[in-house]
Design a protein with these regions (language model features):
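N-terminal transmembrane-helix/juxtamembrane module of multi-pass inner/ER membrane proteins
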Residues: 1-12, 42-74
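Loop-to-helix transition at the N-terminal end of transmembrane alpha-helices
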Residues: 2-5, 30-35, 130-133
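Alpha-helical transmembrane segments
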Residues: 3-6, 10, 27-30, 102-109
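Hydrophobic alpha-helical transmembrane segments
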Residues: 4-23, 83
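Interfacial segments of alpha-helical transmembrane regions
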Residues: 15-43
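Membrane-embedded catalytic cores of phosphoryl/pyrophosphoryl-handling enzymes
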Residues: 21, 62-153
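Short, Lys/Arg-enriched, Gly/Pro-containing loop segments at transmembrane-helix junctions
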Residues: 31, 54-55, 149-153
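Small-polar-interrupted transmembrane alpha-helices in polytopic inner-membrane proteins
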Residues: 32-48, 103-117
């Protein structure tokens, strides 16, 4: 259950606080990452892929749906996975700003488990999760360009 919420938007709060305390110069990069990821994900879900159903709407035999207590099963706005985009955006952000090598495998496992959990709790298809990873990658690259161009003087 915890991993299913690994990419919840609230994860940005401790990321913001830690960046503010220890890596203040990267705050614009973090904010750009949050904004880019949110805009790309939500515009995709609400405008471009609005009719994309989730597994619960597609699989007619409810016995095949794995249910987890505490997880509300949604039926629409599946593509891309916003939780996965958030988890991978945070992971990639940490990779960019940290010199510590252990961040890469630990962060990758965190993000990957978050994406896998979205499939496990029947909230997304694997393609939705893959698209969430792509959103994160594009968001982090765009945010880095913005950061370098406007804030890294």
């Amino acid at each position: 259950y915890i991993w299913a919420n690994a990419g919840d938007g609230f994860i940005w709060i401790p990321a913001f606080a830690l960046t503010l305390m220890y890596k203040k110069k990267f705050l614009p990069f973090l904010l750009a990452t949050i904004v880019c990821s949110t805009i790309i994900t939500q515009s995709s879900k609400q405008v471009f892929f609005k009719s994309e159903n989730r597994p619960t709407a597609v699989i007619s035999d409810n016995a095949l749906i794995h249910k987890v207590s505490g997880i509300v099963l949604h039926t629409t706005n599946s593509f891309p996975s916003g939780h996965t985009a958030t988890a991978f955006s945070l992971f990639l952000f940490c990779c960019f700003i940290s010199a510590k090598k252990w961040i890469v495998p630990l962060g990758f496992i965190y993000a990957l488990l978050g994406g896998y959990a979205r499939i496990y709790v029947a909230q997304h298809f694997p393609l939705d999760v893959g698209a969430g990873i792509l959103v994160a990658y594009c968001s982090i690259l765009l945010s880095w360009v913005i950061h370098i161009h406007y804030f890294n003087k």
